[in-house]
Amino acid sequence: MHILPIRPKAGRLLISLLCSLLFTLPAHAQEADTAGVKELQGVEVVGRHVTGKLRHDSLGGMSLDLSFLDDMPRIAGNADPIRYTQLLPSVQTNSELDAGLYVQGCDNAHNGVSINGVQLYDIQHILGIFSVFNPSHYSRLQFAGSAFTASAANRLGGFIDMQRPDTLAGRVKGELSVGLISSQGTLHLPLGGKSELILSGRGAYINLLYGRWLKVEESAIRYSFCDANVTWLYRPNAHNTLWLDFYGGNDRMDYQEDGEKYDARLGWGNRMVSMNWEWKRQGLVLRQTAYMTRYGNRFSIERPDFRLRMPSGITDYGYRLSLRRGRWTAGTEWALHSIRPQQPETEGERQTTTLSATRRHSTEGSLWADCKFAVARNVELLGGLRANVYTIRRSAFFSADPVLSLLWTPGYGQFRLTANVKHQYLFRTGLSAVNLPTDFWLPADERLRPQYAYGLSGEYRTDLIPGRLQLSAGLYYKRLYRQTEYIGTPFELIYGDYDYRKNLISGKGKNYGLDLMIEKRTGRITGWMSYSLGRALRRYPGRFSGTFPAGHERIHEFNAVATWKAGRRWSFGATLVWAGGTPFTPPSYFYLQNGNLLSQFGDYNSGRLSTYIRLDVSATCRIKVHGGRESGLNFSVYNANCRHNDLFWRLKFNDGQYYYAPLRPLPKKLPFLPSINYYIKF
């Protein structure tokens, strides 16, 4: 049994804040929820202002207004949009150093994460503590747990798209946030009446103040990152919009292990450039995008007797076109993938190996169409088909991915039922079980054939109290085929004849689950609570016996998110995560052989980490608000409940004794992370 260590007063405050999502409903108790009244020929129309920032569409997608993050708890000074996406139903919460995003039981590599429709790869800063997305540069986040239309990219999992503002600011405006370990800012510059330049940047100086405390046990860590966004928006008339997007970011981390006397260095980063044109006339919308997106990492380890380097990367050049008119949508997308798989270079006393840095090139093309039409009263049908062709060397693969959604809207809510087939032609794998940047991308080929999935999902959504309290319940089921697992060890990189193809095995899996969510959308207190029950099972014949849970599976998860506008100056936010532990492979016993410690492990992923519980809280004080200008302070505490959650288990040696114990990210003397940020908006 796990007990949440919260002091009585803090516990009462937390319970009051979260329970208010359900029980703080009367209008007389909510000053910010004042009804607007207009009189039309003797008829009184009452409209209630929706203050919640989460919106749902009829197909099961969600849109999150990123101004929601202003009042939420911050980690290391950042309120990260991807972190808050993990609090939505069907999305799993990560532990502190897991950089993955797991949607409806799928792996991290199954997701499509993009900026205005352009894919980004490996979107983490600080090993997943927050992402590459600077929230002040974007207006909203669009999320879908699965492919609900044929226009969705060739991915088996969920989809996240960071979207630009729809309108020109018309004046100089911006915001700046300064914290103890990082700062960030955004500036909107009008260039005449029809054009605007948006500049954003972030940088970390964590080593300057916290270098002496950045340790995992006795191992020192040095870390830094920076990123930048540039968007140029031009709207010459009501029919045309052009924009250019740029993103660039770099991370660097050094890790020194005193006991083992080695130095590990890791650098990774993204680049993305896109040119976009949107044309609208008489109900027809045409959008075209040409883009380049690139990800690369540089990993090296040095010891007195050897040196190891493992660079890898992926670059895409692509073009996308879409047409929309009325109930019809159609389009095409073509991309050239240039992939550098991980090819280690070793130098040492035992051997020196230099493998050629071979790049693998492949092309991927798609044509799609969607149509939505009424089949009966209150019943609509959305059907779509995506035709794909993928080529690499002398091999070609063809597929047809249909999607069908049935929408029924009686007088008491909306029902949705969706079935789809999806193919994916890129794989991500590596030594890490927590999606570290050392993992690498691979193209499908004649040996590693494309993966695919069959999916079925359903959802019911209704207003328990119209406009105020909304309930949604969903089910999903997916069958996954040609899933890849990497079974190599670090020793093969150093001492063996390394070939990543020899360490890849193929199998299949199935994901299924239930998602429940209740959202309070009006009043001073808004937010949501959600519960997910799900399984993600895998089977690799000939390698592991039977069926086992995927390494990211959390069977149970409860999330609560709340914001409270306490007055003109003060606002408060809180998030609570209570989730089951993820699987790991426990050892059966250890033994010494010729002076070497060897371990015999049990069944694959047969153990579980302890329950994951984390409470984050924040308070925002608006010091000055005048004439469109605002300044204030944000105080946040990460892991305010002071719980030591497990990252993973590992072998330790202490005082001549070997033992197996969990690694925990926060020190015993400071099991929480406070942060303070000063911000200015103008």
Model feature map: region roles:
Residues 314-322, 356-368, 449, 466-528, ...:
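Outer membrane beta-barrel strand-and-loop segments of large Gram-negative receptors
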Residues 374-380, 477-479, 502-588:
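Gram-negative outer-membrane beta-barrel transporters
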Residues 296, 345-347, 408-456, 475-501, ...:
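Surface-exposed extracellular loop regions of Gram-negative outer-membrane beta-barrel proteins
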Residues 56-148, 165:
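Periplasmic N-terminal accessory/gating domains of Gram-negative outer-membrane beta-barrel systems
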Residues 237, 329, 333, 356-480, ...:
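Structural signature of Gram-negative outer-membrane beta-barrels, strongest in the C-terminal barrel
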Residues 181-203, 217-252, 265-287, 325-328, ...:
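Transmembrane beta-barrel wall of Gram-negative outer-membrane proteins
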Residues 31, 221, 239-318, 352, ...:
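Flexible loop and strand-edge segments within Gram-negative outer membrane beta-barrel domains
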Residues 569, 578-594, 614, 621-682:
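C-terminal beta-signal and adjacent terminal beta-strands/loops
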